[in-house]
């Protein structure tokens, strides 16, 4: 089938990596798995083979009949539910997800940040995310040093792990860069007592990264005011630190979140 460039479609076809993604999710038979962008159903097959009850959201209307035909038996049995739409705009309740679930997906690079944010910050977040993303993005999220807005936005909700590099040749059509399997576990919104605390944290982080070449304290002077020095000392942050050198624990301390 002709791939849609506008949807960033690169379908994974290598059996080894398909199995590795499904195995990384540690699926218990009967467990509900939300698959974003099932494409032609290669990963879907691997998930169903491990006993998952798959709920799939596909944006490309041309693939809906393909998937319905391929998984007609599973649809009849109720182990595969297919919905047409944009996963970023779809409410979980609209696709029948109310309890515990996992997210497994080979997602277009251009929606990586938005999709991760959606499923980590839900009132009822996924228990884990296994995502195929751009290699550089996975490295940036999972590394322990040199933080970014994206890495902190993930780590404040869960624990990311870089699983394995997936070479561009494993896809059709092949993308211009390599990909990687990213596993995010132990997901919780419990760090934030309310929406105000959550907003305060992200305002602080985004302001801190506003001008990367400047020292963090300079970026936060207006926001923190006269208390900046005392707050930095309490959080254990060096006066000349840059935003990327500050750990999640220090950011939380700076935001008054324990």
For each feature predicted by the language model, list its residue ranges.
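An accessory alpha-helical subdomain
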Residues: 180-188, 192-228, 235-238, 243-249
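Active-site catalytic microenvironments for nucleophilic, acid-base chemistry
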Residues: 24, 222, 257
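Catalytic cores of RNA-modifying enzymes
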Residues: 1-207, 253
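Peripheral terminal appendages
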Residues: 1-2, 29-32, 42-43, 226-258
């Amino acid at each position: 089938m002709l791939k849609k460039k506008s949807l960033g479609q690169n379908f994974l076809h290598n059996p080894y990596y398909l199995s590795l993604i499904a195995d990384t999710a540690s699926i218990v038979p009967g467990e509900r798995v939300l698959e974003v962008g099932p494409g032609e159903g290669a990963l879907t097959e691997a998930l169903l083979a491990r006993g998952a009850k798959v709920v799939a959201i596909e944006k490309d209307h041309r693939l809906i009949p393909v998937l319905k035909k391929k998984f007609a038996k599973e649809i009849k049995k109720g182990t595969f539910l297919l919905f047409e739409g944009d996963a970023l705009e779809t409410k979980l309740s609209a696709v029948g997800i109310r309890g515990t679930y996992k997210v497994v997906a080979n997602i277009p690079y251009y929606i990586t940040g938005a999709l991760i944010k959606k499923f980590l910050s839900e009132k009822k977040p996924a228990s884990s995310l296994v995502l195929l993303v751009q290699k550089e993005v996975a490295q940036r999220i999972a590394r322990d040093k040199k933080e970014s807005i994206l890495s902190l936005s993930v780590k404040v909700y869960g624990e990311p792990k870089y699983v394995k590099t997936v070479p561009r040749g494993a896809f059709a059509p092949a993308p211009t860069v390599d990909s990687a399997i990213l596993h995010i576990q132990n997901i919780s919104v419990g760090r934030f007592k309310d929406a105000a605390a959550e907003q305060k944290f992200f305002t602080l982080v985004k302001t801190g990264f506003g001008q990367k070449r400047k020292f963090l304290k300079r970026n936060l002077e207006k926001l923190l005011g006269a208390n900046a020095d005392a707050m930095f000392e309490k959080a254990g942050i060096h006066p000349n630190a840059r935003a990327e050198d500050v750990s999640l624990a220090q950011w939380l301390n700076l935001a008054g979140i324990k």
